[in-house]
Amino acid sequence: MNHRRSSIVLLILSILSPVTLSIRYELLSGHTKCISEEIHANAMTIGKYSIINPHEDHPLPSSHKVTVRVTSPQGTAYHESDGVESGQFSFVAVETGDYISCFSAVDHKPETTLIIDFDWRTGIHTKDWSNVAKKSQVETMEFEVKKLFETVNGIHDEMFYLRDREEEMHNLNIATNSKMAWLSFVSLAVCLSVAGLQFWHLKTFFQKKKLI
């Protein structure tokens, strides 16, 4: 029970606290890098990516192109772009699991280093609250209530997700314990059989030697 409460508290803190949603990394030409994100079913996800221009006063060179592929845990492609400098994707996850975004830089000689800026948001983080406030011009209190409502919905969905994961782990533990019990029984039976065979062999040996 205490462990469950701790998990819920950590979940609430992770949702309410600020998170870093943008990453920037280097990618060598001819190489591929993949980033995975655990997303649960029915969650909205949005991604934006772009190649940083090393020379702002000039257009990106032809070597600065990437192929992007976003796939589900079962391998379903949600986004594919070939030879692009930037792009974006959005979808609602159908299944729960690790979704993978892979970036492949075009092969180029001499080898070039690309800097990729990637922003991947999931769940309530797909909401851009600053734009919502500017576009609707709502009162401060109404805006805060709406934001809190969305946060509560996110917590609600995450709690159901954790409950399902906990149930899966519980069923897995039961199945594992059953297999271990069966394996222990088989091991005991094998040991007793071997001991019986050894006893019979020794008895036969001593009888032949007329020691018993």
Swiss-Prot record:
* GOLD domain location: 32-147
Query: Which residue ranges are assigned to the Cytoplasmic compartment in the record's topology?
Result: 201-212
Q: Which residues form the signal peptide?
A: 1-22
- Omega-N-methylated arginine: residues carrying this PTM: 165
Q: Name one Pfam family in it.
A: EMP24_GP25L
Topological domains annotated Lumenal: 23-179
* Principal subcellular localization: endoplasmic reticulum
Keyword Transmembrane (UniProt): yes
GO BP terms: protein transport; vesicle-mediated transport
Query: Motif COPI vesicle coat-binding: residue span?
Result: 205-212
* Coiled-coil regions, chain positions: 162-175
Transmembrane domains' residue ranges: 180-200
Arranged from A to Z, the UniProt key words for this protein are: Coiled coil, Endoplasmic reticulum, ER-Golgi transport, Golgi apparatus, Membrane, Methylation, Protein transport, Signal, Transmembrane, Transmembrane helix, Transport
User: Where does the record place it?
Assistant: Endoplasmic reticulum membrane; Golgi apparatus, cis-Golgi network membrane; Golgi apparatus, Golgi stack membrane
Q: What is known of its domains?
A: The cytoplasmic C-terminal domain contains a functional dilysine-retrieval motif, which is involved in the retrograde Golgi-to-ER transport of the protein.
Q: Which PANTHER family match?
A: TRANSMEMBRANE EMP24 DOMAIN-CONTAINING PROTEIN
Q: How is this protein organized at the quaternary level?
A: Probably oligomerizes with other members of the EMP24/GP25L family. Associates with the COPI vesicle coat (coatomer). Associates with the COPII vesicle coat (coatomer).
Homology family: Belongs to the EMP24/GP25L family.
**Name of the protein described by the UniProt record:** Transmembrane emp24 domain-containing protein p24delta7
Native organism is Arabidopsis thaliana (Mouse-ear cress)
